[in-house]
UniProtKB/Swiss-Prot annotation:
Pfam families: Porphobil_deam, Porphobil_deamC. NCBIfam families: hemC (TIGR00212). It is an enzyme of class 2 (transferase). The porphobilinogen subunits are added to the dipyrromethane group. It catalyses: 4 porphobilinogen + H2O = hydroxymethylbilane + 4 NH4(+). Tetrapolymerization of the monopyrrole PBG into the hydroxymethylbilane pre-uroporphyrinogen in several discrete steps. It comes from Proteus mirabilis (strain HI4320). This is Porphobilinogen deaminase. InterPro entries: HemC, Porphobilin_deaminase_cofac_BS, Porphobilin_deaminase_N, Porphobilinogen_deaminase_C, Porphobilinogen_deaminase_C_sf. Keywords: Porphyrin biosynthesis, Transferase. Monomer.
Length: 313
């Protein structure tokens, strides 16, 4: 292999750095002589912390600066949390590797209550996600949902300071940061369907950089990739972004792919759901047909209202 060094573009948050260091470690296990360097940077999503994500607008809030580093050859690969990766890529770039998925569920985190069911009426729950908000409001319309921004540590500090009675975070992020003890319970997919790609780490690079792609091949987890691609196919057909009330989750079940999806109004009053059970080779097409089913049920109207800023969070 002619390439001796790989530079990884990454956000500077603790969780993003964990992901980049994980990819570095896996690359060096697969290729012991390879030199791997990190190129930390700050994204728009890291800077704008006083506005709910759904109102910031635009796609790629957490990836654009990393992609510019790839296009200018300041980095060879960019490591992303798959739930933050937009459906479209700049010309010349693409998603080439999806690593094995961690637990994709949402975590219920509280200092006083063990579960969502235990929260008294009127409790304040923090989340920056319209996907989580719509499902929480559908389950518990008596709760008050308030915006919660910042990295994992910042969000936990706000909980500890008494700003919230509970917050919802990703199980995967808490596990990776060795904060599992903060998880009071994990929400089932029936309670809170995960985001597209949640729990998976993806690697983006220049499509003409075949040497780098060859090095990355060892990190691709085929079973995870099949599931995430089905979820993303659904999201692509819906023309969904990362900050919209869309959930999609695929798992392997007896050799087939079970794909579930939802689109919800932010107030939780309307939740459109659908599912498919298909052979792996049909997984992406199933994502498309599932999206079309949701569109037929009224998903377009819900998403249009969200894009126009009619959100409650």
């Amino acid at each position: 292999m002619s390439k001796s060094t790989i530079r990884i573009a990454t956000r500077q948050s603790p969780l993003a750095m964990w992901q980049a260091l994980y990819v570095k470690e896996q690359l060096q296990i697969a290729h012991p002589s390879l030199v791997v360097e990190l190129v930390p940077m700050v994204t728009k999503g890291d800077i704008i912390l006083d506005t709910p994500l759904a109102k910031v607008g635009g796609k790629g809030l957490f990836v654009k600066e990393l992609e510019l580093a790839l296009l200018s050859s300041r980095a060879d690969i960019a490591v992303h949390s798959m739930k933050d990766v937009p459906i479209d890529f700049p010309e010349g770039l693409g998603l080439v590797t999806i690593c094995e998925r961690e637990d994709p569920r949402d975590a219920f985190v509280s200092n006083h209550y063990d579960s969502l069911e235990q929260l008294p009426a009127g409790s304040v729950v923090g989340t920056s996600s319209l996907r989580r908000q719509c499902q929480l409001k559908a389950l518990r319309p008596d709760l008050i949902i308030r915006d919660l921004r910042g990295n994992v540590g910042t969000r936990l500090s706000k909980l500890d300071n008494g700003d919230y009675d509970a917050i919802i975070l990703a199980v995967a992020g808490l596990k990776r940061l060795k904060l599992t003890e903060r998880i009071r319970s994990s929400l089932s997919a029936e309670q809170s369907l995960p985001a597209v790609g949640q729990g998976a780490v993806g690697i983006e690079c220049r499509l003409d950089d075949h040497d780098t792609q060859a090095l990355l091949a060892a990190l691709n987890h085929a079973d995870t990739a099949t599931c995430v691609k089905a979820e993303r196919a659904m999201n692509t057909r819906l023309e969904g972004g990362c900050q919209v009330p869309i959930g999609s989750y695929a798992i392997w079940q007896n050799g087939k792919i079970w794909l579930r999806a939802l689109v919800g109004s932010p107030d939780g009053e309307t939740i459109l759901r659908g599912e498919r059970l298909v052979s792996p080779e049909d997984a992406e097409q199933a994502g498309i047909s599932l999206a079309e089913e949701l569109l037929d049920k009224g998903a377009r109207e819900i998403l249009t209202a969200v894009y126009q800023g009619n959100t409650a969070i």
